[in-house]
Amino acid sequence: MEPSMIVVTTENVTGYRTVRMLGQCFGVVVRSRGIGGNFIASLRSIVGGEIHEYTQMLEEARRHALDRLVHNATSMGANAIVMMRFDSAEIGQTMSEIVAYGTAAVIEPAR
């Protein structure tokens, strides 16, 4: 199990001071929905509303990308990730790329 990692979308962590910035880190996931899933989703898109199959796939992909980000930051020696963000893009018509990225840092409680 990974040691505890503080992940924030801000530049600083309240109550902590930054000891060292280690640099950028990221976690990337590319997901594809199979032909059957695309067919069902396309039928649902005709009616309108949320397409639950894609929502679930993207939520899982974000969690997976965040897990990879934490793993990569840990391997760099970080105990925190600051300025964390998500980005996404379509690859072709059937794949989605999800990227979680931020700055790996070493922090300690403020004195």
From Swiss-Prot:
Superkingdom assignment: Bacteria
Record-linked InterPro entries: UPF0145_dom_sf, UPF0145_YbjQ-like
Species whose genome carries this gene: Bradyrhizobium sp. (strain ORS 278)
Matches recorded under PANTHER family: UPF0145 PROTEIN SCO3412, UPF0145 PROTEIN YBJQ
Family: Belongs to the UPF0145 family.
Gene3D superfamilies cross-referenced by the UniProt entry: Hypothetical protein apc22750. Chain B
SUPFAM superfamilies for this protein: YbjQ-like
Membrane-traversing stretches: none
Listed name of the protein: UPF0145 protein BRADO6695
